[in-house]
């Protein structure tokens, strides 16, 4: 669940909706913005 992208989670969490780590990971892979 928490891999190399785990470092991005705190950054994405700021000013964005509180998504789960798995959802954020899938979003980053998809290349879509969650904000």
From Swiss-Prot:
Q: Does the keyword Calcium apply?
A: no
Per UniProt, what is one GO molecular function of this protein? toxin activity
Q: Which ranges of residues are annotated as propeptide in this record?
A: 1-10, 19-35
Q: What else is known?
A: The typical symptoms of amatoxin poisoning are gastro-intestinal distress beginning 6-12 hours after ingestion, a remission phase lasting 12-24 hours, and progressive loss of liver function culminating in death within 3-5 days. One of the few effective treatments is liver transplantation.
Role according to the record: Major toxin belonging to the bicyclic octapeptides amatoxins that acts by binding non-competitively to RNA polymerase II and greatly slowing the elongation of transcripts from target promoters.
UniProt crosslink position (Cyclopeptide (Ile-Pro)) = 11-18
Q: Which residues carry this modification: (3R,4R)-4,5-dihydroxyisoleucine?
A: 11
Q: Which organism is it from?
A: Galerina marginata (strain CBS 339.88)
Q: Which residues carry this modification: 4-hydroxyproline?
A: 18
PTM description: Processed by the macrocyclase-peptidase enzyme POPB to yield a toxic bicyclic octapeptide. POPB first removes 10 residues from the N-terminus. Conformational trapping of the remaining peptide forces the enzyme to release this intermediate rather than proceed to macrocyclization. The enzyme rebinds the remaining peptide in a different conformation and catalyzes macrocyclization of the N-terminal 8 residues.
Q: What InterPro entries does the annotation carry? A: Amanitin/phalloidin
Keyword annotations for this protein, in alphabetical order, are: Hydroxylation, Thioether bond, Toxin
Q: Which residues carry this modification: (3R,4S)-4-hydroxyisoleucine?
A: 11
Please report which protein family the annotation says this sequence is part of. Belongs to the MSDIN fungal toxin family.
User: What name does the UniProt record give this protein?
Assistant: Alpha-amanitin proprotein 2
